[in-house]
């Protein structure tokens, strides 16, 4: 009997992607985050769809509609808490996934890496427009501050900002279009994920050692399906604990007040997952310079493959590069902390030093470390 999973046109694609896929036998738990991100995306789309059924994108009723979801809709409070905290889990997995890619040299699969960076930017855009929708104080002022950055672009800046706003300030037109963007972007993300996987399966997965794993591969199912299932359970457990016991711990208290254009909150700050970029933006005292640094802080990921100087792919056997990688990690945590602090000393100078160190590590120190490690490994006799 012919196996349908190997002959049916649709089943064949699923089979080659998730069942009979040859996978390196030594990939660690750091390779779980791809599937966890897929799960996060599914959770966000499903909870978001049900929230959209009850939400109204009008400045007069948006805030009330979110309150109505939490109070009057069956399990609406759960949907909202899962969606809000699901975004945090999504970004946590994203940062760990990108970090894994940098540590183990996965960025040398250039197409997969570049699509991944585009995915990161798209997810960030989705999260930003989504944060505006509840129309609380921080939603409104966050939208005002970030969209205002467009006006720093020479010549066309002001026109561009007003075009995004649909008026002369953030108002009803802005909220309506942001809701439209927030609804469509996850489906664009899903399409990009398919392309991301398509390019990944052209080359096969990297592995911790960074050497060609073709001589030692095992089928994805059952070995990695069961491993992913464990990851799913741990992620769901973490998300449920967060959403059920401490749903507002990652949010801003200002967002429990309806948006008021006449009253500016004392400290305008985005959600925690944008704070590192916000700190880099604030550390430059020039508006256009700050915007360029903000863009560079994310787009720098695109040139990481060009900065690879080592003869080894992975950092597994490169202690100097490992040290610099963990300094970079600590630096990003420092930037995240600074982004949430008021603009005053000593936070200003710490933020500026951390911003300089961020670019210095990626552009100069890590490539130099790779060259030095190559030199140290050369036979000296």
From Swiss-Prot:
Alphabetic keyword roster: Electron transport, Heme, Iron, Membrane, Metal-binding, Mitochondrion, Mitochondrion inner membrane, Respiratory chain, Transmembrane, Transmembrane helix, Transport, Ubiquinone
GO term, biological process aspect, one: mitochondrial electron transport, ubiquinol to cytochrome c
Binding site for heme b b566: 97, 196
Transmembrane segments: 33-53, 77-98, 113-133, 178-198, 226-246, 288-308, 320-340, 347-367
GO MF term (any one): metal ion binding
Gene3D superfamilies listed in its UniProt record: Cytochrome Bc1 Complex, Chain C
Membrane topology term: Multi-pass membrane protein
Cellular-component GO terms for this entry: mitochondrial inner membrane; respiratory chain complex III
SUPFAM superfamilies linked to this entry: a domain/subunit of cytochrome bc1 complex (Ubiquinol-cytochrome c reductase), Transmembrane di-heme cytochromes
Cofactor mode of binding and number, as noted: Binds 2 heme b groups non-covalently.
Binding site for a ubiquinone: 201
Pfam families, alphabetized: Cytochrom_B_C, Cytochrome_B
InterPro entries for this protein: Cyt_b/b6_C (IPR005798), Cyt_b/b6_C_sf (IPR036150), Cyt_b/b6_N (IPR005797), Cytb/b6-like_sf (IPR027387), Cytochrome_b (IPR030689), Cytochrome_b_C_euk/bac (IPR048260), Cytochrome_b_N_euk/bac (IPR048259), Di-haem_cyt_TM (IPR016174)
Subcellular location as annotated: Mitochondrion inner membrane
Cofactor: heme b
Keyword field contains Nucleus: no
Residues that coordinate or bind heme b b562: 83, 182
Quaternary structure, from the entry: The cytochrome bc1 complex contains 11 subunits: 3 respiratory subunits (MT-CYB, CYC1 and UQCRFS1), 2 core proteins (UQCRC1 and UQCRC2) and 6 low-molecular weight proteins (UQCRH/QCR6, UQCRB/QCR7, UQCRQ/QCR8, UQCR10/QCR9, UQCR11/QCR10 and a cleavage product of UQCRFS1). This cytochrome bc1 complex then forms a dimer.
Family membership: Belongs to the cytochrome b family.
Note: Heme 1 (or BL or b562) is low-potential and absorbs at about 562 nm, and heme 2 (or BH or b566) is high-potential and absorbs at about 566 nm.
Purpose of the protein: Component of the ubiquinol-cytochrome c reductase complex (complex III or cytochrome b-c1 complex) that is part of the mitochondrial respiratory chain. The b-c1 complex mediates electron transfer from ubiquinol to cytochrome c. Contributes to the generation of a proton gradient across the mitochondrial membrane that is then used for ATP synthesis.
Protein name, as recorded: Cytochrome b
Organism whose genome encodes this protein: Sarcophilus harrisii (Tasmanian devil)
Organism lineage: Eukaryota, Metazoa, Chordata, Craniata, Vertebrata
Gene name of the record: MT-CYB
């Amino acid at each position: 009997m012919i196996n349908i999973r190997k002959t049916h046109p649709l089943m064949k694609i699923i089979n080659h992607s998730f069942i009979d896929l040859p996978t390196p036998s030594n990939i660690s738990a750091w390779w779980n985050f791809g599937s966890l991100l897929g799960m996060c995306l599914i959770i966000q789309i499903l909870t978001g769809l049900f929230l959209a059924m009850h939400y109204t994108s009008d400045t007069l009723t948006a805030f009330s509609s979110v309150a109505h979801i939490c109070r009057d809709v069956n399990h609406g409070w759960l949907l909202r808490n899962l969606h809000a905290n699901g975004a945090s889990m999504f970004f946590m997995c994203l940062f760990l996934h990108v970090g894994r890619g940098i540590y183990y040299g996965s960025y040398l699969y250039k197409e997969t890496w570049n699509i991944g960076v585009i995915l990161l930017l798209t997810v960030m855009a989705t999260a930003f427009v989504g944060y505006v929708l509840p129309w609380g104080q921080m939603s409104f002022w966050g939208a005002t501050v970030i969209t205002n950055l467009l006006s720093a672009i020479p010549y066309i800046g002001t026109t561009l900002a007003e075009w995004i706003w649909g008026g002369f300030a953030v108002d009803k037109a802005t909220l309506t279009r942001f809701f439209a963007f927030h609804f469509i972007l996850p489906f664009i993300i899903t399409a990009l994920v398919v392309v991301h996987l398509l390019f990944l399966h052209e080359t096969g997965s990297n592995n911790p050692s960074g050497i060609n794993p073709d001589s030692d591969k095992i089928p994805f199912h059952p070995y990695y399906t069961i491993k992913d299932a464990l990851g799913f359970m741990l992620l769901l457990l973490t998300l449920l604990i967060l959403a059920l016991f401490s749903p507002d711990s990652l949010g801003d208290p200002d967002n429990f007040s309806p948006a008021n254009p006449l009253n500016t909150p004392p400290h305008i700050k985005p959600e925690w997952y944008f704070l590192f970029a916000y700190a880099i933006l604030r550390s430059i005292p020039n508006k256009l310079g700050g915007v360029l640094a903000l863009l560079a802080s994310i787009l720098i990921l695109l040139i990481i493959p060009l900065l690879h100087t080592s003869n080894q792919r992975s950092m597994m056997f490169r202690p100097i590069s490992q040290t610099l990688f963990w300094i970079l990690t600590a630096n990003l945590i420092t930037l995240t902390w600074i982004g949430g602090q008021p603009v005053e000393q000593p936070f200003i100078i710490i933020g500026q030093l951390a911003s300089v160190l961020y670019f210095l590590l990626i552009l100069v120190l890590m490539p130099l470390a790779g060259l030095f490690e190559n030199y140290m490994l050369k036979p000296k006799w």
